């Protein structure tokens, strides 16, 4: 009999951002404010603050001591004062942060925020803090009543920054703000569906723009046998072709002439992409990549570095996530294939504990394969595969999802089931259902840009690594290779071609993982980046989700391995930090449709439990948090009704 495994840790591939909590420990307005539903967008300008107190009292004491020293030393010490920044919070959830301005009691930010919100709140809080090496100190806060926000009037002016005693934190201390709330019902962008047609410009406020004239191939699972799925007719009586994902990836890698760039949560060299006896294609991914590198193709692998797997002086630890990252690196060690193991890192200036949390709990979860392909006329173009399938063990599956009958054939050396300690006799394999796609066209170059930004960041040497060879020159310089056409030259599908796709790339990543974001945080807004504490954030995938849900007219369909969010509105554990708006937006969408007496359906498909031991502490914790998403604290009978429907769907 197979045995249950011991409890093991889990790794979340999502972003840690939009997860901050900011509870103001004192009242910022006299009396109690009315709780309102603030659902729409907040357009905010945090302009400047004046006459802030000096919170660096230690440095102030040093300054007093050094004032008796020569003029130059005295002048330097007296310049040390508060390093202020502002957090914006609603219902206890941080929805925005300014950048830090060092050594200023009169900081000028002039920073703009356009934030989607779906919160029950009494006040919008602006909390002014002093950034310190060991954390931050509260200077004071400004509270704007939610009822005043929802009046529709623009709020603009200077507001006293209050301390815990209800008085200004310093005489004359004030914060200059401009706030305009727009309810979701008044936003034209959501009234005509998700968007299509020649006038559609994509999701606004994102890092990558909409790219027109591409071609997309969709895949269900790693492989689809002929005839195993129903025939589907598309518009214009076009026959839909079910794709063969891993076979197409194998062929694309085999036909590459210049580059093969791969990212993954896990990339395992022993995995076989093609099975069922395809002639000449029965080789492992590792052997295939070595062959291509020997042909002169630049092969780069960017793989998440599991902090629990290590290889040092011949001693190896497999790692609790079983990603085989060290084994894959060792396999390619003496080849021309370059492998970078990339850990998740905390932001500059984050505390030691925060950095440990980020490195342990979160992972890099992108899965991309980028190759050059034939573009005709002796030219090459960029093609990218992207989606949910890692090139590792346990991922090869078909829509039939067999549990036992393939254990001696296509899954003979690939029986992975982390529900059990060892896949002994009678142990079924774990089926794996996921989606993937191939992008051919201008958007593929954005996926290439993502890889280059990540590679340049991950390859930057630190500490003793500076003595080793640099990886900076590993990326191909396309301006020196005229054979590879650029994004401006790539041919586009005609607008009226039924196979034409307009594609926009979204992601969740920050400046600790990419190189290329602005050095000056003041430039973040122009690149549609959010500002965290000492970090810039691309949260475009969250922006896209919100836009799609708000614009949906008839239904929402979601498949995901996890479903966590809107913890600021849970009935308990509000401080868990899963502050994305997705569950709340779905609940409000259904409530609005009920009020309008319009039919609407939300289909949310998640596993019975995510990968791992169902009785293990990490899995039970995730299941507990997921249940909280279905019992969001309702306010109003119609919301209670729609949330009850969601609970019914879940169970």
Task: Indicate where each model-derived feature is located.
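Short amphipathic, basic-aromatic surface patches that mediate peripheral association
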Residues: 28-30, 45-78
